[in-house]
Amino acid sequence: MRQFQDKKVLVTGGSRGIGKSIARAFADQGARVAINYRSNAAAAADCLRELGGKGNIALQADIADPAQAAMLVEDAISGLGGLDIVVNNAGIYLWHPIATADFSDWIAAWRQTIDTNLLAAASICYCAAQHMMRHGGGRIVNVSSRGAFRGEPDGPAYGASKAGLNALSQSLAIALAPHNIFVGVVAPGFVETDMAAEWLEGERGDAIRAQSPLGRVARPEEVAHAVLFLASPGAEFTTGTIIDVNGASYLRS
Ligand code: NAP
């Protein structure tokens, strides 16, 4: 029996990068997965093909819009026939250094980042929790970032959005435990995906890899491994925890 046999899982931003690895790892363990994406339908179709099996679906929604986020949860529930696990993985990073960004760009970056990285997760947690509370419980895993702790000098809204996501997750861990809903967080450092490609392939690439004593950044599967652990049977008492997946590049205690 595979660990997530017949579990119904929604992964936001599940069409590429870390989300795709998370979707694949759940599918490999027997789950039925709904992958959400914003606009790249071709990547979502490729991902769905790679997942193989039956019953996986791709759902387009711009989750920065709360109405679309709510509809996404409804569509996932009806398309999968229920919802046991939600992974809030979709996120964006926008460059807006305070020394050079003009005020309107600064505000636009803050709004877009908070709407995508924090408000979307809050919307989806709300809608998913309503379903889970009526159906005996569930799991929520949120994908945060090392930047929440270490700071993001060129993308302060990103760091703030992920710190907010950590606080949201921990508040919900307390609020939802009596309803048998457990909430965990995974906080990666740099990961080999499109989001980080420009840095990793650029002149700072070697310095970034050297931040870890392993001399490299994370692979998406390594983040997925931590996500599946938090969603697995037996991990209930870890609720409220934040797992670092940063290769000891930033240590906190
Ligand atoms: P990625 O390769 O850029 O992929 C982003 C995914 O999110 C895509 O599927 C994208 O869909 C989707 N997405 C973005 N905005 C969306 C929206 N408004 N509505 C719905 N879907 C949306 O990103 P990644 O590197 O895998 O990152 C995944 C998560 O890990 C993010 O939360 C990120 O902050 C976090 N993280 C990443 C790193 C890193 O180094 N890569 C480090 C720490 C944390 P489309 O393709 O359709 O746009």
Predicted feature descriptions by range:
Residues A70, Y93-R111, R134, D154-A157, ...:
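Conserved mid-core segment of classical short-chain dehydrogenase/reductases
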Residues S145:
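Residue(s) in the substrate-gating loop at a strand-loop-helix junction
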